[in-house]
Design a protein with these regions (language model features):
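Short, hydrophobic/amphipathic alpha-helical patches that form generic packing surfaces
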Residues: 72-87, 293-301
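Surface-exposed acidic, glycine-flexible loop patches that form ligand/cofactor-binding
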Residues: 2, 10, 89-93, 141, ...
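Glycine- and acidic
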Residues: 43-46, 56-70, 92-102, 152-154, ...
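Short coil/turn segments at secondary-structure boundaries
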Residues: 2-11, 76-78, 183-184, 268-273
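Conserved AAA+ ATPase small/helical "lid" subdomain
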Residues: 243-301
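Conserved NTP-binding/hydrolysis core of motor NTPases
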Residues: 74, 83-260
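Segments of Walker-type
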Residues: 1-71, 207
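Helix-boundary capping/turn motifs
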Residues: 51-55, 147, 271
């Protein structure tokens, strides 16, 4: 169920009161004081009238039809569902993964990533540019939301900083964040938390460090379409209208997905292991291949 927050930012859930400053009128119009809540305040639930709602089946069908090339729509649907249960999946073997949508300029790769994220949050929120965003900002994004995908755009083998690249290897796979000393003195060590799944976009596949990142992700090629038909344009616009909370929104679809959490917690571990065992029997088990099989087994489960 959904429990609404009041104007002071207080919500009662399961008999306990919680204070959410990002949604409190205390901070409304307070200028710089509200800047730290700017991103968090975008994560809202919208009650959509029944006659305007898009069902899960309709949303999935649109995703599949709009991004039909190379079955990218199917990959996007699967990963969007996986994101909703990232916390439940990651804790099984401390493993997760990420899709890497690779294609030329204007191929639509970023739109696929935004469509995945739009199940959770408004598509109008800026995505993270790996070329101009700071290392610290990326680290903060990873811990801001739990199970809400972050889009990392403009991956480039040549220009990406080594700190970002090494961080990505942990973020997309085992969820390990950067270790650092707590404070300027002392011996306490703290880890940057990684709670968010990511979707990466770029014009080239990651090939640094002997393909260390590439073996942890699923590469989905997005070729540039030569000619879009009128029907394809209309389907794309329809999907984007549905994704926009100002027009319709997907809150009810996300609720349908989240209701599956008990089933995911009960069956996912066994299904993932079964998928991995089947892949091991069919393929030669080398180091890099083994990592790819573990990654693929998450989608198969």
């Amino acid at each position: 169920r959904f429990d609404a927050v009041n104007e002071l930012g207080v919500v009662t859930h399961n008999g306990k009161n919680y204070y959410l400053p990002a949604f409190s009128t205390i901070y409304a119009g307070s200028g710089k004081q509200s800047d730290k809540y700017e991103l968090i305040s975008q994560l809202v639930y919208k009650e959509i009238p029944i006659d305007k709602r898009c069902t899960f089946d309709e949303w999935a069908s649109l995703m599949d039809r709009v991004y039909k090339i190379n079955d990218n729509g199917k990959w996007a649907i699967l990963f969007a569902i996986m994101c909703a249960f990232r916390s439940n999946i990651h804790c099984i073997d401390r493993l997760f993964t990420a899709p890497f949508f690779m294609g030329p300029m204007s191929s639509g790769k970023t739109q696929i990533a935004i469509s995945i994220r739009s199940l959770f949050i408004s598509p109008k929120i800026p995505i993270f540019n790996l070329n101009i965003g700071t290392d610290a900002a990326m680290s903060t994004l990873m811990s801001t939301f739990r199970d809400v995908p972050v889009v990392l755009d403009e991956y480039n083998n040549k220009d990406i900083s080594d700190i970002k690249f090494q961080a990505l290897k942990g973020i997309v796979y085992d969820g390990d964040g950067r270790q650092k000393r707590k404070g300027t003195s002392g011996k306490e060590i703290e880890n940057d938390k990684v709670y968010a799944p990511v979707v990466i976009c770029g014009q080239e596949t990651p090939q640094r460090d002997d393909n260390a990142l590439m073996s942890r992700i699923i590469v989905c090629e997005v070729p540039k379409p030569k000619n879009r038909t009128r029907e394809e344009v209309e389907l794309f616009n329809k999907l984007k209208d549905i994704e926009d909370p100002a027009k319709i929104g997907l809150s009810n679809v996300l609720f349908e997905v989240l209701q599956l959490r008990p089933l995911v917690m009960q069956h996912f571990r066994a299904l993932k292991q079964k998928s991995y065992d089947e892949l091991k029997q069919a393929l030669i088990n080398a180091g890099e291949i083994d990592r790819l099989m573990k990654t693929a087994s998450l989608f198969l489960a």
